[in-house]
Amino acid sequence: MSKELAQEWLVSALADLKSIQYIMNDAFLTHMVAFHGQQCVEKCFKAVLEYTGKRVPKEHSTLKLYGMIKDQVPLDIEIDVLTDFDDLYIDARYPGEFGLLPDGKPTLGEAHEFFDAAMHIFETVCVYLDIQID
């Protein structure tokens, strides 16, 4: 168990949340909101793995990582959000049609939903691990 490394993951996750707060109302950057949301959730899940002494894989899929921690943390999340995070993760890194939702870039409303989901997961994991991040 490494509470220190778990805390480092969560500090990095908070940086993603703060980045989202700066860009979440810009319609041009909604795909970047999704990217930072995905990064936040990925880091939160890896914090749980670190805290519980499990090997942290070189894996980016929030769905796969959630499968590894869902019995550890009581998270109330919709799997569809994790699917969207995984689908949109590529879009922020590559041009073209890769990583877009079926209807294209996320809307501003969807961007806010991604932020809310990431914030909920971050806060829940912090409480579960008894780690405070300022």
Predicted feature locations:
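Terminal alpha-helical segments
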Residues: 1-134
